[in-house]
């Protein structure tokens, strides 16, 4: 049986180690933000890591709901990850949450 490619808006556990300096580290959930056409053919994708620490919110961040729990999407940690780093699909974000992430990305990247 063929495995369906990761899709924009999916949340996967991703192994970010090894990391350097202040890069995101450890295995944590991240939302896929790259487009589905690229996700089907490339061996890498763009992701935004999520954290359960929602105490402080910066302009380049967004609060989203993952399986009923609040998470902070950190657009300042937007990164490209090999599909080999993907461990397990944990859910999918709502359209509203993806709009909030897109807004955070625009702020972070000055678009």
Mark where each language-model region is.
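Conserved functional hotspots at enzyme active or ligand-binding sites that engage polyanionic ligands
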Residues: 1-111
């Amino acid at each position: 049986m063929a495995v369906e490619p990761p899709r924009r808006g999916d949340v996967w556990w991703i192994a970010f180690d090894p990391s350097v300096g202040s890069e995101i580290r450890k295995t944590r959930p991240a939302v896929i933000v790259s487009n589905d056409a690229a996700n089907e053919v490339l061996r890498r994708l763009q992701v935004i890591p999520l954290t359960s620490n929602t105490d402080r919110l910066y302009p380049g961040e967004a609060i989203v709901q993952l399986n009923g729990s609040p998470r902070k999407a950190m657009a300042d940690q937007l990164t490209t990850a090999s599909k080999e780093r993907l461990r397990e699909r944990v859910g999918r974000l709502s359209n509203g949450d993806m709009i909030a992430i897109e807004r955070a990305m625009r702020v972070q990247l000055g678009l």
